[in-house]
A protein has these predicted regions:
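N-terminal mature ectodomain segment of secretory-pathway/periplasmic proteins
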Residues: 27-103, 191
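Extracellular/periplasmic ectodomains of large secreted or surface enzymes and adhesion receptors
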Residues: 205-246, 279-280
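Gly/Pro-enriched, hydrophobic low-complexity segments
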Residues: 51, 55-58, 64-68, 169-204
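Metal-associated gating/positioning segment near the N- to mid-region
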Residues: 289-332
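Solvent-exposed helix/loop surface patches that form functional interfaces
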Residues: 31-33, 82-174, 197, 212-223, ...
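Hydrophobic h-region of N-terminal signal peptides that target proteins for export
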Residues: 6-17
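Histidine-rich, glycine-flanked metal-binding segment
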Residues: 254-296
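Short, hydrophobic/aromatic-rich segments at coil-to-beta transitions
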Residues: 18-25, 43-49, 69-77, 97-100, ...
């Protein structure tokens, strides 16, 4: 899994004219858990060490990379251990029109004619900032990804926070194409990564630490708007009763499967189960022909950690009830 998606750090700007060293705090539930320290020079070369401790687990990655004029990596090398302490050794380079990569889980090469951004299997979280800046430079703010895929970036609002020298305006961007949900990253007006935050894990420079509640509120508003649009696009409410006919229905009482069954749903409740011949739908009922496929009650998932996409994914996979373990009850 590409662990850098949710862990972004403040570092280098779009235009850097001199060598620079930067460091940022890693917080887990508001408590100090680690640091990331980066050294950047004017040639576009970065040396970054990223390390944190989460109850004995946690990444410790040292990486070096080079960028071209478009901000896209042409070389990457990383080593250390991942979150579960498994060793990491990863290399990537672009040479003679070919991109080549190798890590613990895959090895490949691909001819490239335009810009393509390599996503390491295990990278320091600053690499998310590198991707954001490259996307902002790219045509239509889109880039092909290696080994596969495409990413895009969109601005989602601004927040004014207290910085080391007074008020600073931070810009919220959301990167699409890395996972089921857009990934949020905060940049300042110079293109420097300003923060990556969540209720669990945050990476942020000390000067912005007190602004975490402001940034979280802005992120949550953007997340709610995205979830609302998704629900509007995907949800369809029947105008009347809903009848599923011609189903092979699972009966949990005796673990049998009964053919030729109908199920009547009214509103958000199953109100009747009967043989097809005994079910007389109302005139305005919506009929779904199961074509003798298997039908069963919704599943329970007894151990989840909810995010904005869990509801849609659960329903798509037949899960209608779930339990979140030790997370924010507002998400439940």
């Amino acid at each position: 899994m590409r662990s850098f998606i949710a862990l972004t750090v403040t570092f280098i700007g779009i235009a850097q004219t001199s060598a620079e060293q930067r460091s940022d705090k890693i917080l887990i539930q508001g408590n100090a858990a680690g640091m990331q320290i980066g050294h950047f020079d004017a040639t576009g070369t970065a040396h970054v060490e990223y390390s944190y401790n989460d109850r004995g687990r946690g990444d410790h990655i040292t990486a070096t990379w080079k960028l071209d004029a478009a901000g896209v990596p042409t070389e990457y090398e990383g080593h250390g251990n991942d979150y579960m302490k498994a060793p990491i050794e990863e290399r990537f380079e672009v040479k003679d029109g070919k991109a080549r990569w190798k890590n613990r889980s895959e090895q490949g090469e691909q001819a490239i004619t335009g810009e393509a951004f390599y996503i390491p299997a295990n990278a320091p979280s600053e690499f998310s900032g590198v991707l954001a800046r490259a996307l902002l430079k790219a045509p239509d703010h889109k880039l092909s990804l290696l080994p596969a895929g495409e990413a895009s970036i969109q601005e989602s609002g601004k927040v004014s926070v207290d910085g080391a020298s007074g008020k600073v305006e931070l810009i919220q961007y959301r990167i699409t194409g890395l996972g089921f949900t857009p990934q949020t990253i905060w940049l300042d007006h110079d293109g420097n990564t300003a923060a990556s935050i969540s209720g669990w894990f945050s990476v942020i420079p000390a000067q912005y630490e007190l602004a975490i509640p402001q940034l979280q509120a802005a992120q949550q508003a953007a997340d709610n708007a995205w979830s609302g649009r998704l629900a509007h696009q995907l949800a369809r409410v029947p105008k009347g009763d809903l009848v599923i006919r011609n189903a092979r229905l699972f009966d949990p009482r005796d673990l049998s499967v009964k053919p030729g069954m109908s199920v009547l749903v009214r509103g958000d409740r199953v109100v009747r189960v009967a043989l097809d011949a005994d079910m007389k739908p109302s005139a305005d009922a919506e009929i779904i022909d199961a074509h003798a496929r298997f039908l069963m009650p919704g599943l329970w998932d007894n151990h989840q950690h909810f995010s904005d996409v869990e509801g849609a994914l659960d329903l798509a996979n037949g899960v209608t009830s779930s339990r979140d373990m030790a997370n924010d009850t507002d998400n439940s």
